[in-house]
UniProtKB/Swiss-Prot annotation:
Protein known as: Transmembrane gamma-carboxyglutamic acid protein 4
GO CC terms: endoplasmic reticulum-Golgi intermediate compartment membrane; extracellular region; plasma membrane
PTM text: Gamma-carboxyglutamate residues are formed by vitamin K dependent carboxylation. These residues are essential for the binding of calcium.
Record motif LPXY motif, residues: 186-189
Gene name, Swiss-Prot/TrEMBL: Prrg4
Residue numbers bearing the Phosphoserine modification: 164
Complexes and interactors: Interacts (via cytoplasmic domain) with WW domain-containing proteins MAGI1, MAGI3, NEDD4, NEDD4L, WWTR1/TAZ and YAP1.
GO molecular function: calcium ion binding; WW domain binding
Originating organism: Mus musculus
Residues in the Cytoplasmic compartment per record: 135-226
Length: 226
């Protein structure tokens, strides 16, 4: 009596489980017949957005199962286009419709987005190059504005050790005559002293009135007689 009660209690669960199994078998059997999609589904497929492969050039690189069906959801038409064979497509779709895009190996494996990593590295390199060029330009402008210390030191040395006027006594000038003045065409010390004496002696001022002891003769201009 007790086993009969147990069987009767399990009848609702059996009635709920059997239609689900029958429906899944019917879907798997009629999957190859659903090759042609409707107009709305085709438009949705043509205007679909890229998910994980948005950085890849999908128009130029051929698609594969890992990128089209494991990284994102794919349809039966996409799988058939990649595999190119009806038998392989049916086998793949039977397992793919049950497991879905994620597999056991993909769950344990950490995926690295290579394209995002490369994009970040390229952007960082471009910014480093731009900052380097800006720093080089700033250094050039600062160096142009700042005077060179070597040129200022040379100027102070020449100004300090080569005076424009050299004072000498007459004895030193006689004992050690300079050749630089002769080469430059400048007068010697004796010539300079003679010139200064000649120009410094001024003539006496003239006295007013006629000079004493001298007669002043006036010359008259007359026309000759005919």
């Amino acid at each position: 009596m007790f086993p009969l009660l147990i069987v009767l209690s399990q009848l609702p669960r059996l009635t709920l489980a059997v239609p689900h199994c029958i429906r899944s078998l019917k879907d798997s059997e009629h999957a190859p017949e659903e090759v042609f999609a409707s107009k709305e589904a085709a438009n949705i497929f043509m205007h679909r957005r890229l998910l994980n492969n948005r950085f890849d050039l999908e128009l130029f690189t051929p698609g594969d199962l890992e990128r089209e069906c494991y990284e994102e959801f794919c349809s039966y038409e996409e799988a058939r286009e990649i595999l190119g064979d009806d038998e392989n497509t049916i086998k793949f779709w039977q397992t793919y419709s049950i497991k879905g895009p994620t597999t056991g190996s993909d769950v344990n494996k950490e995926k690295i987005d290579v394209m995002s990593l490369l994009t970040g590295l390229i952007v960082a390199g471009v910014f480093l190059v731009i900052f380097g060029l800006v720093g080089y330009y700033v250094c050039l402008t600062k160096c142009k504005r700042r005077p060179y210390p070597s040129s200022s030191a040379n100027y102070t040395r020449t100004a300090r050790y080569t005076p424009s006027i050299v004072f000498r006594s007459p004895e030193e000038a006689v004992l050690s005559p300079s050749t630089s003045s002769e080469d430059a065409g400048l007068p010697s010390y004796e010539q300079a002293v003679a010139l200064t004496r000649k120009h410094s002696v001024s003539p006496p001022p003239p006295y007013p009135g006629p000079a004493r002891g001298f007669r002043v003769f006036k010359k008259s201009m007359s026309l000759p007689s005919h």
